[in-house]
Amino acid sequence: MSARPQISFVVPAYNEEVLLPACLNAIRAEVARTGCDAEILVVNNASTDRTAEVAEAIPGVTVVHEPIKGLVSARRCGFEAARGVLIANIDADTKVPPYWLDRVLESFAADPKLVALSGPYDYYDVPLHIRLFSRAFYAMGYLTYAFNKHVLGVGSMVQGGNFIVLRDALAEAGGFSDTFQFYGEDTDIARRMNQVGNVTFTWKLMAQSSGRRLRGDGVVMTGIRYSANYLWATFFRKPFTDAWHDYR
């Protein structure tokens, strides 16, 4: 077997034939620009559309299949298939911008204790007022994260579809937990990763993502749900909300 890639990109995908190509091509552009040794994995998560065929048609992409539908099941499948020293978890409706990969590699090279790195979303397909609201929400979330981490000494923060982990550190932290199936899964990872090394959330690692959940659930309700699940995952180690809707 060849040496481990420097980074594995894992993209869970359930019925994502429309948005998936833009996600994968953005990743491919970053890999090509940097010359980084990387692999790109799409986890076809029980899709009923052409997700698998679309992914297989893109050069350099490997498709693995997870028949049990659910975000955490898909992330775990990708984690088990990935060979990279680092694993970048990118959602199928998300696009990494130019120089995103530089910031990732530089951050891990600069801090030998860094085990997880993440940044916020910039929602590219919603009106300006919703984008501004989301940035204000992230700002409040960041203050809560900083207080919990540096004052109370509990938990940390990552954005589920835009985070990178040191593979061996995630294995040491126990991998992905079945306690969380959607809401709170990223906070749970951040909390456990924080026990084995440094977890950093930075505005310098912003990624572009679809605001389809903001449109579907409403901005206020989305904010309430994510806030409640962040607190429940941090302090009670379980989700506040078990059900979710797939917006496509």
Language-model features, listed with the residues they occupy:
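Short aromatic/hydrophobic "clamp" motif used to bind/position activated sugar donors
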Residues: 87
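A conserved acidic beta->alpha catalytic loop
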Residues: 26, 44-52, 94
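Conserved donor NDP-sugar-binding/catalytic core segment of glycosyltransferases
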Residues: 99-131
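Short, flexible, basic/aromatic active-site loop/helix in glycosyltransferases
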Residues: 119-126, 134-156
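Acidic donor-binding loop at a coil-to-helix junction in glycosyltransferase catalytic cores
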Residues: 182-189
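Acidic helix N-cap motif at the loop->helix transition within catalytic regions
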Residues: 18-21, 48-57
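Short, well-formed alpha-helical segments that are part of the catalytic scaffolds
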Residues: 16-31
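Glycine-rich, basic loop-to-helix element that forms the pyrophosphate-binding segment
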Residues: 66-82
